[in-house]
Amino acid sequence: EVGIPSQAKEAIAFAILASCTLDNEPGNVPSVTGASARAVLGSITPAPLQRAAAPRNALVPSAVPADRSSLLTEQRLPESMSLDSMPLNEALDLMSSQDQQAVAAVRSQHAEIATLIEIVADRLHRGGRLFYCGAGTSGRLGVLDAAECSPTFRTDPQMVQAIIAGGEGAVFAAIEGAEDDTQAGAAAIEIRNIGPSDVLIGIAAGGTTPFVIGALAAARNQKAATALICCVKPTASEPPVDVVIRPLTGPEVLTGSTRLKAGTATKLILNTISTLAMVRLGKVHENLMVDLRATNQKLWDRGARLVALLTGLQRESALELLRSADGSVKIAVLMQRGRLTSQEAQAALAKSGGALRVALELNAEKR
């Protein structure tokens, strides 16, 4: 630092942060800039979430907002018109009965969901990536599902990712106006180099979110496979995609609050897509998550129990075997049942495309 002007040091620091951001690697250089927050989606040093509220007129739209009153998700539910004065037990029964409609709505979309699962599994098998994209509740649901794939299925963190309008901070608090930025949605696709080998699933309960529409259009331009999950009937503004999953959950108990039935249906759909796509990638044996990543005590325990279940070993011996297999349930099972070394088990698993069932069958044929 000796002899370097402060302006030059500041310029260098901001160049580093900008580079990290463009590479989609949030960074922070507190020793140089004094920043306490990481760089997020183009913001060099984003403001802390505890900042004072913006002036009231800052949130007033510059243009007349589109009239969304015709959307199914914006309608009033007759059964909940007296929600504010309804006895608690009655309100509980009402919400529970309405939640059942979310399940039924998902069931009505099984054909479309199956089509999308096949597309996702094919692209992932060929080395592509799956992206969820949404704003608000829809974006957070994508984050939830993407975050669970690595520990559950031992996937590379890059394989399944989530894009949320407003960036990382929007996971924890509303970022006003972020969902209205179509260009930001398109930029999110460009910065991640999404292309023909990838899949983008847009999530928008009302089907009109500009950020999601911009992202889908950009992904489609790059020849990526695209899909939309929405809870309304077709509209003129609906973007063209390869697959539309349309669970019509109907009006919400709390009018317009799509974190309720629409959110429930969306979570069920994302659960189904990721789980069954991973089954097709050989990451499940029987109904067991044999590709789990043992990152904590709970998962080491579960892994040991899986090894014991599939080999007949006692828990202590299974845990020792799992450790020798570097935490891989598949390798541990192949070592025990196939009488293989760790290296031989890895080779057998690679030959079978990662499917434990196939690897066990091939090894049995050799003996």
Set out the residue ranges of the language-model regions.
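A short, charged, Gly/Pro-tolerant segment at domain boundaries
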Residues: S31-L59, A294-K298, N363-K366
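Short, amphipathic alpha-helical interaction segments embedded in low-complexity terminal/linker regions
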Residues: T272, A277-R367
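Glycine-rich phosphate-binding loops that contact phosphosugars or nucleotide phosphates
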Residues: F131-I269, S274-L281
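Gly-rich Lys/Arg/Thr-decorated short loops/hinges at beta-loop-alpha junctions or inter-strand turns
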Residues: T73-E74, L94-A102, A162-A173, H285, ...
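Conserved Rossmann-fold dehydrogenase catalytic segment
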Residues: S6, R76, P251-S257, G282-Q297
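A short, well-structured juxtamembrane/interface segment
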Residues: S108-H125
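Cofactor-/ligand-binding subdomain signature composed of acidic, glycine-rich
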Residues: L59-A105, Q109
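Glycine-rich phosphate-binding/hydrolytic loop that grips phosphoryl groups
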Residues: V2-Q50
